[in-house]
From Swiss-Prot:
<feature type="binding site" description="via carbamate group">
    <location>
        <position position="103"/>
    </location>
    <ligand>
        <name>Zn(2+) 1</name>
    </ligand>
</feature>
<comment type="function">
    <text>Catalyzes the reversible cyclization of carbamoyl aspartate to dihydroorotate.</text>
</comment>
<protein>
    <recommendedName>
        <fullName>Dihydroorotase</fullName>
        <ecNumber>3.5.2.3</ecNumber>
    </recommendedName>
</protein>
<feature type="binding site">
    <location>
        <position position="178"/>
    </location>
    <ligand>
        <name>Zn(2+) 2</name>
    </ligand>
</feature>
<feature type="active site">
    <location>
        <position position="251"/>
    </location>
</feature>
<feature type="binding site">
    <location>
        <position position="251"/>
    </location>
    <ligand>
        <name>Zn(2+) 1</name>
    </ligand>
</feature>
<dbReference type="GO" id="GO:0008270">
    <property type="term" value="F:zinc ion binding"/>
</dbReference>
<feature type="binding site">
    <location>
        <begin position="19"/>
        <end position="21"/>
    </location>
    <ligand>
        <name>substrate</name>
    </ligand>
</feature>
<feature type="modified residue" description="N6-carboxylysine">
    <location>
        <position position="103"/>
    </location>
</feature>
<dbReference type="InterPro" id="IPR032466">
    <property type="entry name" value="Metal_Hydrolase"/>
</dbReference>
<feature type="binding site">
    <location>
        <position position="255"/>
    </location>
    <ligand>
        <name>substrate</name>
    </ligand>
</feature>
<keyword id="KW-0862">Zinc</keyword>
<feature type="binding site">
    <location>
        <position position="17"/>
    </location>
    <ligand>
        <name>Zn(2+) 1</name>
    </ligand>
</feature>
<feature type="binding site">
    <location>
        <position position="140"/>
    </location>
    <ligand>
        <name>substrate</name>
    </ligand>
</feature>
<feature type="binding site">
    <location>
        <position position="19"/>
    </location>
    <ligand>
        <name>Zn(2+) 1</name>
    </ligand>
</feature>
<dbReference type="GO" id="GO:0006207">
    <property type="term" value="P:'de novo' pyrimidine nucleobase biosynthetic process"/>
</dbReference>
<dbReference type="InterPro" id="IPR004721">
    <property type="entry name" value="DHOdimr"/>
</dbReference>
């Protein structure tokens, strides 16, 4: 990586956690990812969810159809785990190169997760098969019991689900997605080479005060929810340390404005247009730009056993204003940091 003060040249990054949606929304958001990233792990929580090889093949084609000419982008598809999923279907998809990984959503933990897993025991045959074939498990790490406070769901998940699971299936590769707490940062750092994590730009840049003090900011509302400053700092320190089992996963999750600015608003930040520059800003603030390229472009492929991208992109350090909104067919989409001035952006 070469890093004169105003330009950062890095190997083309990948996004290891992305929501592209479907239909018109997919067509609108796709270019913001495909112009920057070489690959992305695409979340399967459509309605209905992606639970079969055929559904994944069809969705992959819709994604490719939405990629503009001139963009070189590969979607990496995932299977949505359910209590009734057939392990043979999962293995077939993995062997045919359709499924890169499988996603565990605890039932009702986040958007379109009502079909999710009710207990680890319910899917143990599937998880045992994944361990056997070397297929990574991607985990939304929150418990959903009504008596557990929303700010404590991730820490409880580590203790009650993640650690028992990893003790039981010691060879299973696990990505603890969008970690948000010091508990998770410590857990991943202290884990073995079969455990990795992704972190979003919003959880590195903000804490719950930013979302709640002086008025509710619905466009910072995502799940897992922003936590206390102590947790934000732990995440920043983890990425700044150069730790090699944490990597870029934006969790970019678009919702139309009326679904965010609502009496019961949806969870998710549409950060695809601004994520890479946001990460660069954090690494610069932490005096850790020497680790930026690995976080964006190397650590993820290394964990997944994939080659790194062979093309490069440049970020330029000059102030730019983020658009207030992006047009949809019948509404608008508000990007992460809308209307704000950002320090780093991708050189066009």
């Amino acid at each position: 990586m070469t890093a004169p003060s105003q330009v950062l040249k890095i190997r083309r990054p990948d996004d290891w956690h992305l929501h592209l949606r479907d239909g018109d929304m997919l067509k609108t958001v796709m270019p913001y990812t495909s112009e920057i990233y070489g690959r992305a792990i695409v979340m399967p929580n459509l309605a209905p969810p992606v639970t079969t090889v055929e559904a994944a093949v069809a969705y992959r084609q819709r994604i490719l159809d939405a990629v503009p000419a001139g963009h070189n982008f590969t979607p990496l598809m995932t299977c949505y785990l359910t209590d009734s999923l057939d392990p043979n279907e999962l293995e077939r998809g993995f062997n045919e190169g359709v499924f890169t990984a499988a996603k565990l959503y605890p039932a009702n933990a986040t958007t379109n997760s009502s079909h999710g897993v009710t207990s680890i025991d319910a899917i143990m045959p599937v998880l045992e098969r994944m361990e056997k074939i070397g297929m990574p498990l991607l985990v939304h790490g929150e418990v959903t019991h009504a008596d557990i406070d929303i700010f404590d769901r991730e820490a409880h998940f580590i203790e009650s689900v993640m650690e028992p699971l990893r003790q039981r299936l010691t060879a299973l590769k696990v990505v603890f997605e969008h970690i948000t707490t010091k508990d998770a940062a410590d857990y991943v750092r202290d884990g073995n080479e079969r455990l990795a994590a992704t972190i979003t730009p919003q959880h590195l840049m903000f804490n719950r005060n930013h979302m709640l003090v002086g008025g509710v900011r619905p466009h910072l509302y995502c799940l897992p929810i922003l936590k206390r400053n102590i947790h934000q700092q732990a995440l920043r320190e983890l990425v700044a340390s150069g730790f090699n089992r944490v990597f870029l996963g934006t969790d970019s999750a678009p919702h139309a404005r009326h679904r965010k600015e609502s009496s019961c608003g949806c969870a998710g930040c549409f950060n695809a247009p601004t994520a890479l520059g946001s990460y660069a800003t954090v690494f610069e603030e932490m005096n850790a730009l020497q680790h930026f390229e690995a976080f964006c472009s190397v650590n993820g492929p290394q964990f997944y056993g994939l080659p790194v991208n062979d093309t490069f992109i440049e970020l330029v350090r000059e102030e730019q204003q983020v658009a207030e909104s992006i047009a949809l067919t019948d509404d608008t989409l508000v990007p992460f940091l809308a209307g704000e001035t950002v320090r780093w952006s991708v050189k066009q």
